[in-house]
Amino acid sequence: MQLNSVEELIADIRAGRMVILMDDEDRENEGDLIMAASHVRPEDINFMITHARGLVCLTLSRERCKQLNLPLMVDQNGAQHATNFTLSIEAAEGISTGISAAERAHTIRTAVAAHAKPSDIVQPGHIFPLMAQPGGVLHRAGHTEAGCDLTRLAGLEPASVICEIINDDGTMARRPDLEVFAEKHGLKIGTIADLIHYRMTNEQTVERLSQETINTEYGAFELYKYREIGNPDIHLALVKGEPRQGVTTVRVHGFNPVRDLLKLNKADGSTAWSLDLALRTISESDRGVLVWIGQDHLEDLGHAIHHLNQPMPLKSNAALSQQYQTIGVGAQILRDLGVEKMKLLSSPLRFNALSGFNLEVVEYITADQVTAK
């Protein structure tokens, strides 16, 4: 089945229709119904709970959550994909139990009204708001961000109603199931990867500030400085060779005082990628890029040591939320530098919709592999 273009999805969102959006097969590998929150009707909620069967959620921007004084459900997010649930809500007026399709639609419309205020809603309730990351799918490639992006691109309030699609037997619907669902109900269907690609093509969210040659302990590198538009943090890229000419050795690195200054190993005894080790490894390659992601704050030393000393299963992403939230920035910088195929200095990780950035990981290289040589 041929997927629909992002332009087609945006047009349907603008017209008040639902669309299906799928994420990468190596992430949640699911599809959600998405529609503009400002257009939601009782029959739309009824369709979601009858045919999709997932949890009906309301995606909101950080600004809207602040406007409604909505706190996050938990301070420390341990969810696998770091979805930002706020406290559940109900409209303060015009409802009885709040669970009917009509009353859920009323709660949603109340929350996204232009002049909505905290007193218009109460907690808890039967609608589950999700706070999107600033920067949308270029920052975190989840359905939460995709819903806000699609509605914003449609010229509407950046808020959407989303619901996971579940098969008749209770299992999650995967792409073949979702294509059948879309055809059966006459819905447009697309991917978050395509939405990322659309935004990368039509928007500039990371700007290059400067370029200069610097000399390091490991030789000369080209130093590029970047900044996200609307964000004061500075990101750096150290480049060796010409990334456009072939497979490039890449490290996307966030500063950690324990790992980078004290050079402690992980709790399981394995070696962590320090800034020094990554730079040395890249210097030994024909082509390499080290992207240093700036942060608005540095975690305190005690917390950093505790975090590094906690055993974490390979495929658990709970401790990787910071990496999931910043990989989009690193990916944009890599694309600006011409990187396409890369050897990634990292343990195997599932990055959100990486294909949307036209990036391909051909090999993962762990720090232990390098130090064992």
Locations of regions flagged by a protein language model:
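Catalytic domains of riboflavin
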Residues: 1-373
